[in-house]
């Protein structure tokens, strides 16, 4: 627990192990960008067209009127804030540096992949459906946390699956293509906490990376910090009220043979305010074979990616070292070559 950032006194200066060279943390453009906002209560034809257009252009978009109630969203945000303010002793049993442990509290302070560490603490939970007895493996404090997590994850999962159906309709493939093993793995919940940082210009909450799953929904919280790679620059994201920020994972890129891209993004820190966000990852099962769908292949458009078992992809992804660009995956095709 001594590595947990939020459990230690506020730092007056940034420890050397967290300092990145300036060329590794290029500043974002000054403009703050509002990602495309898609109202899921609009007509279905309009919604699926908007999702596909936004996905092709930026790989990121926002959804509103998505079906997750404002109360559920506020309850989740409130519970997460309370969790990170609990005394260290109440969280000690959750702390683990074992990456393969499904439910754990960990810190970027223990990651030394590229020589530097990351200014983030994270509570990661595996959420199978139906939840059943798995709920007993989640934290039970603050009181009511388990029920809030179950309700939030169930509703967010439903939104993710509906977005996948809309994408299928927009691309002209079978609407239930992503049902079953492709989206049937445990939903992974990352509750990220970025404490206030004494020198945010030289630190990273998370390095540039692409998500390894199918599709991700982010509850971004009240403090901005997400930045997205776009046309060679980093753009700051200004989330809309009560919206989820959505991005495509690498498995969606593989299935669509590159039609939809998984885009690099990073998390920055703030000198005055702590930031808490909640990422919901829709995952394939570990045994799922994932490759380009035949609907996206032709003589003129051969497969760009191999068909691999998701378990093998995850195994290689977890050991890929950071390159000079700080891209955790370096290149999706290169990761596949190692399998």
Swiss-Prot record:
Residue numbers binding Fe cation: 209, 211, 265
Result of altering residue 11 to P: In strain: cv. Ehimehadaka No.1
Cofactor annotation remark: Binds 1 Fe(2+) ion per subunit.
EC number(s) on file: 1.14.11.24
Superkingdom of the source species: Eukaryota
Gene3D superfamilies according to UniProt: B-lactam Antibiotic, Isopenicillin N Synthase, Chain
Induction (UniProt): Up-regulated by iron deficiency and down-regulated by iron. Not induced by anaerobic conditions.
GO biological process: response to iron(III) ion
Sequence positions that bind 2-oxoglutarate: 275
Subcellular location(s) of the protein: Cytoplasm
GO molecular function, one term: 2'-deoxymugineic-acid 2'-dioxygenase activity
Record keywords: Cytoplasm, Dioxygenase, Iron, Metal-binding, Oxidoreductase, Vitamin C
Pfam name, any one: 2OG-FeII_Oxy
Cofactors required: Fe(2+); L-ascorbate
Protein name as it appears in the record: 2'-deoxymugineic-acid 2'-dioxygenase
Function comment: Involved in the biosynthesis of mugineic acid family of phytosiderophores. Hydroxylates the C-2' positions of 2'-deoxymugineic acid (DMA) and 3-epihydroxymugineic acid (epiHDMA). May be involved in boron tolerance.
The reaction(s) this protein catalyses: 2'-deoxymugineate + 2-oxoglutarate + O2 = mugineate + succinate + CO2
InterPro entries: DIOX_N (IPR026992), IPNS-like_FE2OG_OXY (IPR044861), IPNS-like_sf (IPR027443), Oxoglu/Fe-dep_dioxygenase_dom (IPR005123), Plant_2OG-oxidoreductases (IPR050295)
Positions of the Fe2OG dioxygenase domain: 184-284
A single cellular component GO annotation: cytoplasm
Post-translational modification: The N-terminus is blocked.
Consequence recorded when altering residue 117 to R: In strain: cv. Igri
Catalytic EC class: oxidoreductase
